[in-house]
Amino acid sequence: FSYTQSIKWLTFNEALEAQKIKPKKIIMDVYTEWCGPCKMMDKNTFANRDVLNYINENFYAVKFNGEGNEKINFFDQEFTNPEFIDRRKGRNSTHQLTKFLQVDVYPTIIFFSEEGDPIIPVKGYLNPREIELYLKLIKKGDYFAFRSEDDFEKYKKYFRPKFRN
């Protein structure tokens, strides 16, 4: 068994195409260039061996700049960033897909089903043990059983993380 050193990041278009060949859920990291917590997640969470191995084995991983200029084809629509300014320092205009997915906090992790449908957004910084809960919850499909916020809180309370922080 060999360990890779990093997550195999794809573009969203690549992940959606890969799903047609081999269905897998998608984890999308919506970030920006200026976001401090996003950089911390790259350094502490996505570089964690337990996290990266679990993601590489079970998901298509997408890194998406919420203020970038990538052209995305999703739900039979084309999403772009018409007001994007190249080489701009700091904040840029918000990508149409970012708005469509209702992302208003960076970082936001969005999980998608094998069919490409959004499942859940998770807002803010997550350490390895915090993201583990969501990775396993989504991978196993346990979220289907939740009928309320209380159900999720119970799940969280009894969840025992195995990843090292």
PLM features: what roles do these ranges have?
Residues 6-9, 48-89:
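Thiol-based oxidoreductase modules, predominantly thioredoxin-like and allied folds used
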Residues 33, 66-67, 115, 127:
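Solvent-exposed coil/turn segments that connect beta secondary-structure elements
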